[in-house]
């Protein structure tokens, strides 16, 4: 039998997408930022979860040739998708499933590593971590999204590096970011579904997990 949301929506009048979709920011342009946001929201509001790799976004502060300004970097895009997931509740009953990842050598990898350090984020006389502890739904950066760094063949040449060790430390402290390992002929398969069992290198690929009823 099909799994996941195929079963969830079985027998219901409305027809929705099912399971999760794997997305990639194909290039760092305004048009593609809008495009991946549209793809994500379409999947979310019609029943699918999403996983998105934003490694192709330019690092924050990089000069923009067309406008003369500077790039915002990939983290604001993840925050945009996080907000979409916060506000799109499927069928008014089910929260969105989100996953975001970035290559470990990206110049903004350090920012992703510490994006969920809510215990360091002051709000008045308290911290975001304490507010989240008191109210699970209190908004915080990337709180709707699982995040990971992608490790490829280049990492194998120097696995005990500062980025990886900081990733380990952060994972022990906060549980995130996670680790996505992609080696050899699979190193470009950095796209994941929200639960991360399915891998692909193709944008808009679909999770095809199934289930068997043993009852």
Q: At which residue positions do the language-model features occur?
A:
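Extended catalytic cores of very large enzyme megasubunits
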Residues: 1-215
